[in-house]
Each structure stands twice: as C-alpha cells, then as structure tokens.
Amino acid sequence: MAYLAVLPEAGAAVAGSAAAHWLPVRVVGDGEAVLAFDHAQFVADGVARTQAKLEYTALATAFLPPQFTVNALRQVYETVWDTRLDRGNFHRAVADARKGFLTAVEGETVKARRFQAQLFRRRQGLEAAGLLDHPVRRS
C-alpha cells in the first residue's frame, strides 16, 4: 500500500536514519535514483494517478497557497504533465465564469513582470479532490 501527498512545499524529511531525503520525481522516473524493491513503481503509479486527477479535479490547487495567479496554476499543470500549455486557452479553461473552477479575489493583484496579475482562489465549496464541471485537457 502506498499513499500520495500533495503539498505546496515539502518540509524536512524525517525518518529513522540520515538516509531519508526528498528527491525530484523525475530523478526516480529516469532511473537516476535507485529505490528499494518495487518502490519506483509506487512512485510511477502515484505520478500517473496525479496526472490523471489534474484533468477532472481541482487537485492542482493543492500545490499552491490559497490565493494564486493563473500563471502559477498553469505552471503546476505543466510540471505535473511535463508539457507546455497555451496560456490563453488555459486561462479560459480554468477562470471562465461559466466553465472554470476559480474565483477572482476582488481587488487582489500581484506584480508579475510588467503588469499586475489577478489573484484567484478555488471556487467556494469545491474541495481539491472535488470533480470539475468541465475537465482541463492536456492538449
């Protein structure tokens, strides 16, 4: 049995020995890091499950603080899916008032490059594991 945790930031690894430490998931997937027994398969299964859940749940918001920009959310999708997404199409998919799963935080912006970026939060009543009305597609 294996458990998958999704965190905005990982704390210090604590275990019974000094050998416990965090690794980027790519290092495990590429075979750079050797894990005992079939633990690499556990990681691969967890990554595949997370990639799939991003399409039909609000799970990506669990990687972020409560208020975030659409660009930060897109970076989560791009990182987990290991692919580039069109900025405009992505913004429409997640922030559209009829189809999206985000709510703009009124009057809240952050400086982003040369402009102010609107802050968003997950739609009220929608948990990270909650199903989306309209899926977010990888392509």
Feature-to-residue mapping (PLM):
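A conserved acidic, glycine/proline-rich C-terminal tail/linker
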Residues: 87-88, 105
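Alpha-helix initiation/capping motif
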Residues: 32-35, 83, 109
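Long, intrinsically disordered, low-complexity Ser/Thr/Pro-rich regulatory/activation regions
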Residues: 102-139
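NUDIX/MutT-family hydrolases
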Residues: 1-55, 64-76, 89-95, 99, ...
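Short helix-coil junctions and helix-kink-helix linkers
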Residues: 76-84
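Conserved short-loop catalytic and cofactor-binding motifs
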Residues: 60-61, 78
